[in-house]
């Protein structure tokens, strides 16, 4: 059984026991339980239910493993030729690591 769930504006395929890295969730503590009710599709033993826009009564229950995981550093370099203008910016996205405990449909 799996579900397509929307978390912080991104869609993920969620199955029980799976680990997900999602964009940082404000206020979630390590070890706490988080529920996502914006389920777009549920597949239960080949029986597919598609929501319009969401499936009623369906939710995905997750446990927070680590609330602050930093991604790889992304470097952005700007340059204008012959003018000596150079600028370097770096960014590290913060993620939350989740383990899916169950998919309720």
Curated annotation (Swiss-Prot):
Gene Ontology CC entries for this record: cytoplasm; ribonucleoprotein complex; ribosome
Keywords of the record: Ribonucleoprotein, Ribosomal protein, RNA-binding, rRNA-binding
Record-level Gene Ontology MF annotations: rRNA binding; structural constituent of ribosome
InterPro entries linked: bL21-like (IPR028909), bL21-like_sf (IPR036164), Ribosomal_bL21 (IPR001787)
Keyword rRNA-binding: yes
Function summary: This protein binds to 23S rRNA in the presence of protein L20.
Quaternary data: Part of the 50S ribosomal subunit. Contacts protein L20.
NCBIfam families, per the entry: L21
Protein family (similarity comment): Belongs to the bacterial ribosomal protein bL21 family.
Annotated HAMAP family: Ribosomal_bL21
Protein name according to UniProt: Large ribosomal subunit protein bL21
Organism: Bacteroides thetaiotaomicron (strain ATCC 29148 / DSM 2079 / JCM 5827 / CCUG 10774 / NCTC 10582 / VPI-5482 / E50)
């Amino acid at each position: 059984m799996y579900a397509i769930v929307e978390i912080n504006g991104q869609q993920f395929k969620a199955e029980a026991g799976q680990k997900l890295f999602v964009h940082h969730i404000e206020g979630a503590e390590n070890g706490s339980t988080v529920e996502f009710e914006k389920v777009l599709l549920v597949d239960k033993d080949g029986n597919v239910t598609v929501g319009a826009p969401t499936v009623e009564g369906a939710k995905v229950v997750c446990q927070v493993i680590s609330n602050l995981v930093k991604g790889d550093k992304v470097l952005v370099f700007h340059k204008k030729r012959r003018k000596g203008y150079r600028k370097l910016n770096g960014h590290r996205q913060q993620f939350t690591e989740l383990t899916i405990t169950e998919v309720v449909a």
